[in-house]
Every structure is written in C-alpha cells, then in structure tokens.
From Swiss-Prot:
PANTHER family: ANTHOCYANIDIN 3-O-GLUCOSIDE 2'''-O-XYLOSYLTRANSFERASE-RELATED (PTHR48049:SF176), GLYCOSYLTRANSFERASE (PTHR48049). Belongs to the UDP-glycosyltransferase family. UDP-alpha-D-glucose binds at residues 266, 325-327, 342-350, 364-367. The keyword Glycosyltransferase applies. The keyword Transferase applies. GO terms for biological process: anthocyanin-containing compound metabolic process. Coiled coil: none annotated. Keywords: Glycosyltransferase, Transferase. InterPro entries: UDP-glycosyltransf_plant (IPR050481), UDP_glucos_trans (IPR002213), UDP_glycos_trans_CS (IPR035595). Its EC number is 2.4.1.-. One of its GO terms (molecular function) is UDP-glucosyltransferase activity. This is UDP-glycosyltransferase 79B3. It comes from Arabidopsis thaliana (Mouse-ear cress).
Amino acid sequence: MGGLKFHVLMYPWFATGHMTPFLFLANKLAEKGHTVTFLLPKKSLKQLEHFNLFPHNIVFRSVTVPHVDGLPVGTETASEIPVTSTDLLMSAMDLTRDQVEAVVRAVEPDLIFFDFAHWIPEVARDFGLKTVKYVVVSASTIASMLVPGGELGVPPPGYPSSKVLLRKQDAYTMKKLEPTNTIDVGPNLLERVTTSLMNSDVIAIRTAREIEGNFCDYIEKHCRKKVLLTGPVFPEPDKTRELEERWVKWLSGYEPDSVVFCALGSQVILEKDQFQELCLGMELTGSPFLVAVKPPRGSSTIQEALPEGFEERVKGRGLVWGGWVQQPLILSHPSVGCFVSHCGFGSMWESLLSDCQIVLVPQLGDQVLNTRLLSDELKVSVEVAREETGWFSKESLCDAVNSVMKRDSELGNLVRKNHTKWRETVASPGLMTGYVDAFVESLQDLVSGTTHD
C-alpha cells in the first residue's frame, strides 16, 4: 500500500498477553513500510525478539521499571506476580513517564499506541501527537466496563447482549482481582481503562466486526469517538520454529483427535485443592491428556502438588507440566482433539482457529465474558459448570470434556458444526488483509489530518 509513511511509538502493558498482540500489529504495519519504536521492559526483550519479523522497521527500546514497595525487587512483568499485585506494577509503569517522554523527544513519532498508561494522551499533547488506545481484550469486556456498578446478570440499557454478561455466580472472578495491598497506588484498572478510552484520539480494537460488531458500535456510541478494528491480527506461522521434540514424541503416541490439552495462561495460579481437582477431572475423562499450568499456590513444583497416587495411575496416558509450552503448535498437532482453556483473549482466537473442540474454565472477569461470547453467543464451546464460590469439581470438568469429545454427543456435534463455520469465517484469506489495509488508511488520515464521513 502506498501513501503516507508514518512512525508509531508503542507502549503496551507489561504482560505477555498485551505485548505480543501489539507486536503482531507492529509486524503488519512494518510490512507496509511504516516504522515502529516498541517500548518494553528489559526482561521481555528476549521473550519477544523472535516475533519481530521486520527488525529494520521495528526497533525495541527497553525501559527500566522502577521498584515499588510491595513488589519483589526486580519485578518487571505481570507474569512474575499474583494478579492481586497488578495495581502495584501499574504504579511502577506510571513512574516510567520521564523515560517515555525522553524516547518521544528522541524518535519523534507521529502516533503513540498505548493501553494502560493512561497518561500517554497528556504526554502526546505536549508534543502535538495523536494517540491510539489499542484494546487487546475483547470488545465485550470494554463494553461491560463502560457501565460498571449495575446488577450482575442484568444488561444495562442499550447494552448489546443479554448473554455476554457477568452473572451472580461470577462474582468470585472479580474478588480475584481485588488488590491485597493497602498502599495508595493511583488509579485502579477501571479508572485507567476509562480515562484511556476517553482521552485518546482514536480507539482501536483487536477484533472483527463479524464476531463483535455490536459491541464495537456500543463503544463508539458511548465514547463518542471513532473505533477502528484491526481484525484479530494473528502472527504469521513461523516455519523456522517447530514443536519441541519431547512433545512431538509424546503426542505422536496417540490416535488423531484423542488428546485433551489444558492450558490456563501465564498469570493463573490455582489453589492447591483446585489444581488437584483439575488433575483428577482430566484423569476421570479416560482420554489421554496434557496439562500445562503453573505450580499451585504454596507449591514450588508440580510434582509435590499432585494428588496421591496420581502419577502412577495416569502413567503412559497423562502428563502435567509446569513450564511454558508452544500452545499454537500443540493445538495444531493432529493428536490433539480438545482444548481446555481459561479463555484469555489470545487463547480465545487460537482456539477459534484450531480444529479442537473447546472447553472453557475462565478464571478472571474478562475471561468470563470471552467465555460467554464463545459458549452462549456463538455456541462454539462448552463452559465448565461451577459453584458460586468459583469451585469446579472433577465431575463437572469431566462432563464438559466428554460432552464435546464423544462422537454421538448432540452438544458436541452442535459446537463442532458452529466452530467449523466461525473458523472458516475468521480464517478466510481476505479477512485479515482487508482489516489491516483499512486500518492503515485510517491511521494515514489521522496523521495527515484528513477526515472521511
């Protein structure tokens, strides 16, 4: 695409689920000849540099994350701390403002993309720059945050769905986000998000109109500003990176579509009793399984936390792994037939693109809304039943998995049929290209000051 070439400064929240989609979008912009300066914590450089497909156009600059009382010394990213300490890390991000201003002065960008650093529009105005609030969670999550304080399970006036809602039994997911510290650390998450939405020049959302168009329209109307869509922005398949040999060998020992793969994201740490119940539920399915989760709270290793006799009983059929795994490559392995997921937004798109049956066990508020979108609105997945405390039993997990894995299951056939339809829509060759082209045109207009009705 021709036209004006621009320079973007990106400053995402210090979490893998935010930095990687920012970088995926940076690759799309760089591919079209635009320049990106990408700010991130030093610890994240090594983790992300292999995703940079255009190192001549995308330049990483690291920021020093200052220490904040209440965080372990050296903390830089969200994956290093419990969710309840997120507000402290956000406070540390606020203390990088001087560094960000110095970078803006040095590289002279045309636009600044940000998400949780709510003060970026103030910085940009001082330099005469435009800002884009880039939303990498679902549009439904943002729509629900715009009308806080209502009754759980009751859609507020004008809200576009009676299904994609937090219900009374989901209150536990909000408790998990409540800060455990008593220090005043500035705005909370809701205040940061709403301030960012209201003060940015434009809102951009990593979604597709086909999936969340009604929520995007709602946000545009509520915020009274243009909402641009980037599409899902999937990374290009990396032909140079293959699935680790240990997983190729292990998965290849099973029949096609027979393995249940469970992963709950980089931030979820289960209580020990819930972790054990998860393991027992996987055992109960009777299917081969691979579980990739962090050691539960209070345990330093997976092995010490496993239920008594579990390893011996599932030997040769099940494996619980406490380290990082190549989730997209595992999902694309022919032996994997079911994905049990927390339904973080990145995992939501990966599950939609996969051939696997989808079972969802959300842990936090936005994951619950993503789950409602997939299970209740699109009907492509099954949600694990829970008690009001948030507890899920081994039986409810097993029932959910078997309801989609058994070939004679009416529910399984329904979600498989719907999943196939939506996967074909999302993966259609022209969809992604069309979104990115239109998005770049809108950015060119924003930089040049051109307006289109």
